[in-house]
Structure formats: structure tokens, C-alpha cells
A protein has these predicted regions:
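Generic surface-pattern signal
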Residues: 7-14, 85-88, 124-131, 135
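Alpha-helical oligomerization segments
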Residues: 93-137
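Extended, low-hydrophobicity segments enriched in charged/polar residues
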Residues: 1-85
Length: 137
């Protein structure tokens, strides 16, 4: 699990590259600040929060917490484990230089890549890792 996630993340985020780690939750940031503090990896970060209030949202406002970080393979294994164990809300890591995003979740990862060519390149490289579902799900 960790090797694949680190391989994919290193390809999308680079190595020792500045990234932005984003966590999305429903509710206000102060409702979640204490729960983030329990994670060792979160203590290394300095989160800023944005709250998006939708008047029709039944789940309350959407809180996005973001922090700059340096991505290096293996350095964030505890974050990947917490995501795989479904201990976190939605997480996305953004490389501002490339514009690409690595969004791990408990069953894999979504990638938001800079071009269709890049999608084809990585789809070919990691074809053995992809789902056999016709839509790639």
C-alpha cells in the first residue's frame, strides 16, 4: 500500500517539492481542530482555514483547512496510513508548480493531471494497478 501510494504521489507531487495539503470537512474548523491535533503528521503543519457556507447545505458549512508542506516519499507515511484507515475527511495534495493533485482515499487515489497526454502516460505506466471496471472505478 505505502509503496504504491508513495510511487504515485512522487510522480504527481515530485520529490522535496512544495505542496499544499488540504483537508475538507463539514462543519466549522474549530469543530475539527482538536481531532487533527491527535495526528503526529498534523503537528508539523500550520493550517489556515476557509469556511464556505451554503445556505441549503444540510451538513453545515464546508471547512477547508490547508497548509504548505514539502512532499518527500516516505516522509508522510503516517498521513497515508491514516487516510487508508479512513481516519480523515477528504484529503488532497496540490503541487502549485505543476498544477497536479494527488487525492488519496481509503480505497486508492484520484489524480488530477495537467494534460490528457499525462493521463495517458500514467494510465499506461500503471495499467496493472488500475481497476478492471470499464469506467476505471
Amino acid at each position: 500500500l505505502l509503496r504504491r501510494h508513495n510511487d504515485v504521489a512522487a510522480e504527481v507531487l515530485g520529490d522535496a517539492e512544495p505542496v499544499v495539503i488540504c483537508l475538507c470537512t463539514w462543519g466549522r474548523p474549530e469543530d475539527h481542530a482538536a481531532s487533527f491535533a491527535e495526528f503526529r503528521w498534523a503537528r508539523r503543519l500550520s493550517f489556515s482555514e476557509i469556511v464556505v457556507v451554503k445556505p441549503d447545505a444540510t451538513d453545515g458549512p464546508l471547512a477547508v483547512s490547508a497548509s504548505p508542506a514539502l512532499w518527500s516519499a516516505g516522509h508522510w507515511d503516517d498521513l497515508i496510513r491514516d487516510i487508508a484507515d479512513d481516519r480523515l475527511p477528504s484529503v488532497a495534495l496540490y503541487n502549485p508548480r505543476s498544477g497536479e493533485v494527488y487525492a488519496p482515499y481509503d480505497g486508492g487515489a484520484d489524480l488530477f493531471l495537467a494534460s490528457r497526454g499525462r493521463v495517458a502516460e500514467l494510465r499506461h505506466r500503471w495499467s496493472d494497478w488500475l481497476s478492471s471496471h470499464p469506467e476505471g472505478l
